[in-house]
Swiss-Prot record:
EC number: 2.7.2.11
InterPro entries assigned to the protein according to its UniProt record, in alphabetical order: AceGlu_kinase-like_sf, Asp/Glu/Uridylate_kinase, G5K_ProB, Glu/AcGlu_kinase, Glu_5kinase, Glu_5kinase/COase_Synthase, Glutamate_5-kinase_CS, PUA
Protein name per UniProt: Glutamate 5-kinase
Organism encoding this protein: Burkholderia cenocepacia (strain HI2424)
GO terms for cellular component: cytosol
Lineage: Bacteria, Pseudomonadati, Pseudomonadota, Betaproteobacteria, Burkholderiales
Gene that encodes it: proB
């Protein structure tokens, strides 16, 4: 089996907290130097690289003398502010040794949820790559709140891969890849060498939380691969402890778990809707509506809605959940939650009678709907 990275030109590399902070003992300058050297080698092969690096909060904790990750958001933000300084300085110093300029970019979910800011971020990143700069991206932990957090840098890495239309996402972690079961508990667990990024059984294999330093467990990495596949990007999950792992992947060596994007690439606007707009509520739809959305490419009509949950306004994103509780689609609603509660289970011809007006015959038009 040949590594999918060998034929990939534009890469997003995500490095976890434990790999850049030596399991929380402060920034590991030697390890960061090795990442810089490997990325320089990839650049010499003509590959473009964007680096998503965790470590700001962990470095801030070390500088502040904290042994446990705080739970209060203001303390997390303070740690991020302290740690981000050191993280940026070390990366700049190490890449300069190879004659490479770096750029620091801090993002929040709100930056990508706004279409204009999303396009500006994309333009900036593509310009930096054209100029030969390595962008180093992290979540802007000093200003985020629970409502606008990405949640983890695995998710951020996938969204960046979509943003720049990357060929592949490489998630480097302290684990060898995805196993069929937890290898710490099951001696028969085996490494998954390659799989479809959208395969539902992967999520069951990946259950469990991450380390106390970071926020991402294996499940977040599987979900990140699924997101990256929206833009056609493949994903590799591999151990960052492997010597020269990036160089070896680029040379064609299969390391870790390869998750292949086998779904059709989404149109740019639908990709943005699926990945960057926050879901404000959801509707439960019947089996017939599920069939029409997934197989027929139809719009969602009010008559197919069984239940309405959450508070949302017209034009916001809502999720469409089947009778089994599984999300099948999401899209921009033509009616608020209050209006939807009045018209659900009713044919479109009765909307005006119930509400006194009809904005649209569909709850979600197919042009504003994305299958997930």
């Amino acid at each position: 089996m040949r590594s999918i990275i060998a034929d990939s030109k534009r890469l997003v590399v995500k490095v976890g907290s434990s790999l850049v902070t030596n399991d929380g003992k402060g920034l590991d300058h030697a390890a960061i130097g090795r990442w810089a050297a490997q990325i320089a080698a990839l650049r010499a092969q003509g590959k473009e690289v964007v680096l998503v690096s965790s470590g700001a909060i962990a470095e801030g904790m070390q500088r502040l003398g904290w042994s446990k990750r705080p739970r209060e958001i203001d303390e997390l933000q303070a740690a991020a502010a302290v740690g981000q300084m050191g993280l940026a300085q070390v990366y700049e110093s190490r890449f300069t040794e190879h004659g490479i300029r770096t750029a620091q970019i801090l993002l929040t979910h709100a930056d990508l949820a706004d279409r204009e800011r999303y396009l500006n971020a994309r333009s900036t990143l593509l310009t930096l790559l054209r100029l030969g700069v390595v962008p180093i991206i992290n979540e802007n932990d000093t200003v985020v709140t629970d409502e606008i957090k990405f949640g983890d840098n695995d998710t951020l890495g996938a969204l960046v891969a979509n943003l720049i239309e990357g060929d592949a996402l490489i998630i480097l972690t302290d684990q060898s890849g995805l196993f069929t079961a937890d290898p710490r508990k099951d001696p028969n667990a085996t490494l998954v060498g390659e799989a479809n990024a959208g395969a539902p059984e992967l999520e069951a294999m990946a259950g469990g939380a991450g380390s106390s330093l970071g926020r991402g467990g294996m499940l977040t990495k599987i979900l990140a691969a699924k997101r990256a596949a929206h833009s056609g990007a493949n994903t590799v999950i591999a151990s960052g402890r492997e010597a020269d792992v990036l160089v070896r992947l680029a040379a064609g060596e299969a390391i870790g778990t390869q998750l292949i994007a086998r779904t059709a690439r989404m149109a740019a606007r639908k990709q943005w809707m699926a990945d960057h707009l926050q879901v404000r509520g959801h509707v439960v739809i019947d089996a017939g509506a599920v069939e029409k959305l997934t197989a027929g490419g139809k719009s969602l009509l009010p008559i197919g809605v069984i239940d309405v949950q959450g508070a949302f306004a017209r034009g916001e994103v809502i999720a469409c959940v089947g009778p089994d509780g599984r999300e099948v689609a999401r899209g921009l609603t033509n009616y608020s939650s209050a209006e939807t509660k009045l018209i659900h289970r009713k044919p479109s011809g009765e909307i005006e009678t119930v509400l006194g007006y009809m904005l649209e015959p569909e709850l979600i038009h197919r042009d504003n709907l994305v299958l997930v």
